Amino acid sequence: IGMQLMCLDSEEGDTRCLGIFPAHVVRLRGGENPLKIPHVGWDTVGRLRSPLFDGLGEDTYLYYVHSFAAQACDATIAQTDYGGIFSAALGRGNFFGTQFHPEKSGRAGERILRNFLKL
């Protein structure tokens, strides 16, 4: 929920947020083939564009639990596709947020947290 609060607004409760990231938070739709919502479990992350992801490759698996997600924007530093592309992580200046749970994402999550401490 922390990353979503730093976005412009959210469909969840039709809420204005802090506006640090230029992204709108929308309910996951599930795409052409209905997908299970909430999105719970392991999924890949790609388009890694930050030192936060040093040492990780494209299509690294991370753990998600969510029904809403930030749309991709110019602050997107990682993305995931679950019935459509959404921001898996956002970064701007010294602000970072992740949609996935690094604390539940095993070694990859540990690496991300260690990288964060080095920024």
Protein language model regions, located:
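A short, polar/proline- and glycine-enriched secondary-structure boundary/capping micro-motif
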Residues: 38-41, 46, 87-89, 107-112
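Acyltransferase
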Residues: 98-119
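Short linear Ser/Thr-Pro motifs
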Residues: 8-10, 67, 105
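Cysteine-nucleophile active-site neighborhood
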Residues: 1-39, 114
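Residue-level signature for short turns and capping positions that connect secondary-structure elements
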Residues: 25, 33, 83, 102-103
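Active-site oxyanion/phosphate-handling segment shared across diverse enzymes
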Residues: 44-102
